[in-house]
Structures are given as C-alpha cells and as structure tokens.
Amino acid sequence: MNILNEILENKKREISTMNHFALDNKKYPKYDLLKALSTKNLSFIAEIKLKSPSEGDIFPGADIIQIAKDYQNAGASAISVLTDKKFFGGSLEFLSKVKTNISIPVIQKDFIID
C-alpha cells in the first residue's frame, strides 16, 4: 500500500470514530487572511508540522505555542497548523492553542476526503 492509500484508510477510520463536534465552541478573534496576504510587503504563511511520513519526527516535543509566537514575531502573515495526528503529529488541540496565543490568521491543514 502506498502512503496516500495508507493516509486515506487511516482518515476514514478516524472520521468514523470521531465526535462530529470535535472543535470547541470558543469564540476566537477573527483575522482576515486575504488582507494579511495582500500587503505590499512580503507575505508568507508559516507552517507548524511536527513530523512527516517521509522524514518521521521533525520537532519531537516542540513547544507549538512558542513556535507560533516566533513565526508571528518574524513577520508571518498567517500560520498553517497541521491537525493530522498519525502522519503529521498534529491535533485539533494544537489548532486551538495556536489560535488562542497569536493575533494573525490561522489555517487548519488536514486531509479532506469525499
């Protein structure tokens, strides 16, 4: 089985057992992604990814809040947070923590299947 098929099968199992209201109901500040990326200055989206299928662990035990703050302080226009647990070491909890601790747009990055 190739890695994409493995990811697909894992995501199907994950979805079948997940609570469809998994995200908390907190009200987070909203930041305009289009506006953040439309400045005359350099715009970029930084990514928080703790591991990958090809490289394994990239940043084991990393402090994701500090990483997000460092990205924001370095001038990132937005931050992408991988939320796939098995293959990328992410979680919805990471997404929530990042959104709570920075003041730029945050993007959830995960696999979408249909």
Regions found by a protein language model. Name each.
Residues 1-103:
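Conserved N-terminal beta1-alpha1 strand-loop-helix module at the mouth
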